[in-house]
From Swiss-Prot:
<keyword id="KW-0677">Repeat</keyword>
<dbReference type="GO" id="GO:0007304">
    <property type="term" value="P:chorion-containing eggshell formation"/>
</dbReference>
<feature type="region of interest" description="Central domain">
    <location>
        <begin position="23"/>
        <end position="93"/>
    </location>
</feature>
<dbReference type="GO" id="GO:0042600">
    <property type="term" value="C:egg chorion"/>
</dbReference>
<protein>
    <recommendedName>
        <fullName>Chorion class B protein PC10</fullName>
    </recommendedName>
</protein>
<dbReference type="InterPro" id="IPR002635">
    <property type="entry name" value="Chorion"/>
</dbReference>
<comment type="function">
    <text>This protein is one of many from the eggshell of the silk moth.</text>
</comment>
<feature type="region of interest" description="Right arm (Gly-rich tandem repeats)">
    <location>
        <begin position="94"/>
        <end position="130"/>
    </location>
</feature>
<dbReference type="Pfam" id="PF01723">
    <property type="entry name" value="Chorion_1"/>
</dbReference>
<feature type="region of interest" description="Left arm">
    <location>
        <begin position="1"/>
        <end position="22"/>
    </location>
</feature>
<comment type="similarity">
    <text>Belongs to the chorion protein family.</text>
</comment>
<dbReference type="GO" id="GO:0005213">
    <property type="term" value="F:structural constituent of egg chorion"/>
</dbReference>
Length: 130
C-alpha cells in the first residue's frame, strides 16, 4: 500500500508523486537553453558497505546515482533513488526578520510575538494555540 511502498521501510510510496517515472529511478533527461551545458552536482563516497544500506536525505534540484568499482562475484548492487515529485522550482526566498527585545521576548519583524513565541502567519511554537 501507500504506507509500505517500494523501499520497504514503511514510507516508500507516500503520495502519488512516487509513481512518476521522472521522480523515482529511471533515466532523467536534462535540457538546457543556455550556451553553457550544465555541470551538475556530485556526491561521492568511497566507503565499503556490507549488508542492507538505506540512505535518506535531500539534495537540491534533480539527482542521479551511479556506482563505480568492483562488485564481488557473489551478491548484487542496486541503487534506488527518488528525487521529489517532478515539480521543480524555488517557491520562496525569505530573509530572517530582525528580532528586537530582551532574550527573544520582544517583537520581531515577520516572526513570532512575545513570551513563549506564539506566532503569526503560520510561524509559532507548535503548541496548537495559534
Amino acid at each position: 500500500g501507500a504506507w509500505n511502498g517500494r523501499l520497504g521501510c514503511g514510507c516508500g510510496g507516500i503520495a502519488p508523486a512516487a509513481e512518476l517515472a521522472a521522480s523515482y529511478g529511471g533515466g532523467l533527461g536534462v535540457a538546457s537553453a543556455s550556451a553553457i551545458p550544465p555541470v551538475g552536482l556530485g556526491v561521492a563516497s568511497e566507503n565499503a558497505y556490507e549488508g542492507c544500506v538505506e540512505v535518506a536525505g535531500n539534495l537540491p534540484f534533480l539527482g542521479t546515482a551511479g556506482v563505480e568499482g568492483v562488485f564481488p562475484t557473489a551478491g548484487a548492487g542496486v541503487i534506488n533513488y527518488g528525487c521529489g515529485n517532478g515539480a521543480l522550482g524555488i517557491t520562496a526566498e525569505r530573509g530572517y526578520g530582525a528580532g528586537i527585545g530582551y532574550e527573544g521576548l520582544g517583537l520581531g519583524y515577520g516572526a513570532g510575538i512575545g513570551y513563549k513565541g506564539y506566532g503569526l502567519g503560520g510561524c509559532g511554537c507548535g503548541c496548537g494555540r495559534l
